């Protein structure tokens, strides 16, 4: 049994299934997806089992939109003896290469959350047993595969592994963030998560630094502006609504009452453009391309709201449209997109120009 296990947002299993089916077939890897609505995961069964490992290594995880985590499943163990779950796990995985990390996980559903406490408690004895059997390094080792135990019930587990160079670094594929007490809205967490997912941590001091100028379109009440302000940026917040007074009191925010689709900066000194406006994805996509065409920003983070039907097709279509529009400007643009944990019926898209980022690096 060598299949792919893919974590996703509950309710988006069909989108994850469509995505893995298309991306795998593009690599001449064929199979079918087993989908259970609202389960928070998809199993992709390959006709050639050896191709599961190939996809786990070669299909770029960062390019996947609706998939939070990707791993190879090698064994499914059911009806485990509750007094000794560890022995059958060790027996099943004797052929594994030594792994550098262990993740005992479950699905991101209300039902599965009841297993979360068990998973935490079970991690310690399982880690000790794996190390004792030379299946896990004595210390966490970033460049080794990750050992996954994905529990569907306390006596039912899927065992597998992912590659640390091509997976999500986060437990269950979810960054653990807390909404700051002084943030104007919980939407603030969307942008914070986007920074964690899209911008390498070692580049934060260069690309998310104090003194940068940023624009937040559709800013009110200021959830996204808050994330920029806390990093020391000077922010122009564009919205006809009211901004949180706590943000205005920082002296870092200039509030312009205008339509975010219409307003443009008078100077070409904006680095970040962020946007969480509710509108048709096509309109937002073309607006973002226009900002780059006019050199009104150098890096952007924005959300695309998805329709109720054909969500995967709509997401892919708009990203392809954006890619073609940006190619007319420069071939150095990079587009990343993900349905983040804090996103709902939407995806977050990140755009930057490799050449412009390299110039920032040169200044360092």
Swiss-Prot record:
One of its GO terms (molecular function) is S-adenosylmethionine-dependent methyltransferase activity. The active site is at 305 (proton acceptor). One of its GO terms (cellular component) is cytoplasm. Its main location: cytoplasm. It catalyses: cytidine(2498) in 23S rRNA + S-adenosyl-L-methionine = 2'-O-methylcytidine(2498) in 23S rRNA + S-adenosyl-L-homocysteine + H(+). Gene3D superfamilies: 3.30.2300.20, 3.30.70.2810, Vaccinia Virus protein VP39 (3.40.50.150). One of its GO terms (biological process) is methylation. Keywords: Cytoplasm, Methyltransferase, rRNA processing, S-adenosyl-L-methionine, Transferase. InterPro entries: RlmM_FDX, RlmM_THUMP-like, RNA_MeTrfase_FtsJ_dom, rRNA_MeTrfase_M, SAM-dependent_MTases_sf. Its EC number is 2.1.1.186. It is found in: Cytoplasm. The keyword Transmembrane does not apply. Signal peptide: none annotated. S-adenosyl-L-methionine binds at residues 187, 220-223, 239, 259, 276. Monomer. HAMAP family: 23SrRNA_methyltr_M. Catalyzes the 2'-O-methylation at nucleotide C2498 in 23S rRNA. Belongs to the class I-like SAM-binding methyltransferase superfamily. RNA methyltransferase RlmE family. RlmM subfamily. This is Ribosomal RNA large subunit methyltransferase M. It comes from Aeromonas hydrophila subsp. hydrophila (strain ATCC 7966 / DSM 30187 / BCRC 13018 / CCUG 14551 / JCM 1027 / KCTC 2358 / NCIMB 9240 / NCTC 8049). The lineage of its organism: Bacteria, Pseudomonadati, Pseudomonadota, Gammaproteobacteria, Aeromonadales.
């Amino acid at each position: 049994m060598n299949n792919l296990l893919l974590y996703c947002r509950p309710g988006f299993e069909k989108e994850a299934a469509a995505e893995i089916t298309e991306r795998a077939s593009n690599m001449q890897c064929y199979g079918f997806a087993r989908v259970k609505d609202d389960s928070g995961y998809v199993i992709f069964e390959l006709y050639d089992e050896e191709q599961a490992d190939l996809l786990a290594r070669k299909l770029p995880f960062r390019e996947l939109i609706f998939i939070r985590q990707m791993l190879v499943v090698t064994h499914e163990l059911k009806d485990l003896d509750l007094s000794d779950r560890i022995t059958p796990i060790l027996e099943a995985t004797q052929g594994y290469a030594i792994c550098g990390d262990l993740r005992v996980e479950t699905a991101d559903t209300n039902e599965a959350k009841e297993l979360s406490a068990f998973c935490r408690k079970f991690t310690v004895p399982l880690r000790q047993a794996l190390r004792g059997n030379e299946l896990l390094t004595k210390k966490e080792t970033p460049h080794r595969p990750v050992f996954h135990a994905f529990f569907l019930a306390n006596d039912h587990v899927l065992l597998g592994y992912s590659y640390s160079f091509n997976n999500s670094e986060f437990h269950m594929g979810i960054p653990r963030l807390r909404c700051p007490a002084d943030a104007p809205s919980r939407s603030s967490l969307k942008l914070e998560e986007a920074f964690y997912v899209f911008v390498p941590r070692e580049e934060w001091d260069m690309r998310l630094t104090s003194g940068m100028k940023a624009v937040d379109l559709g800013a009110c009440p200021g959830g996204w502006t808050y994330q920029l302000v806390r990093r020391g940026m000077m922010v122009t917040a564009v919205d006809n609504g009211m901004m949180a007074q706590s943000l205005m009191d920082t002296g870092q925010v200039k509030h312009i009452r205008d339509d975010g689709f219409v307003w443009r900066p008078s100077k070409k000194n904006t680095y970040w453009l962020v946007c969480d406006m509710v509108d048709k994805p096509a309109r937002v996509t073309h607006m973002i391309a226009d900002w780059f065409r006019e050199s009104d920003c150098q890096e952007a983070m924005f959300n695309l709201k998805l329709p109720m039907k054909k969500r995967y097709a709509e997401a892919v279509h708009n990203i392809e449209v954006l890619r073609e529009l940006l190619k007319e400007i420069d071939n150095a643009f990079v587009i990343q997109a993900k349905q983040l944990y804090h996103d709902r019926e939407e995806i977050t898209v990140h755009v930057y120009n490799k050449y412009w980022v390299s110039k920032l690096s040169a200044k360092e």
